Amino acid sequence: MQWRGLLLGGRLSTLGRAGPLSCDVLDLQVTEHGPQVRVVTVGGEIDALTAPELDVLLTAQLAAASLVVVDLERVRFLGSAGLSVLFAATELATRENRYLWLVVPRRGMANRALEATGLGERFNVAETVAAALINSL
């Protein structure tokens, strides 16, 4: 099952199983990899406007699955509000005995934000979704 959503004008609209989406603000996709694994693919900008939608989505996925992988490869901007959401999701996963992994390519925007803030060590980080899935075993 695949879920796709797109944030427009402060509202998240579910678009079902449609083809690839592009948005100037935020693109969120959730793919099930078995009953207890979700991959959340994030594209666009994670800022004060879009971070609450990501927060809601990650909270829901952590309630539904024991492993959530957040693929940040297509993120063009990761602000402090986005970092806060990722940190809160990591804390939630720890409290609920769940696992959260971030996919952060070395040359990506998300990696720059994690390095600039020194927060990279606070997260489980892998360079690819496959590596995150393998490392989580």
Where are the model-predicted features located?
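The feature encodes the CheY-like receiver
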Residues: 78
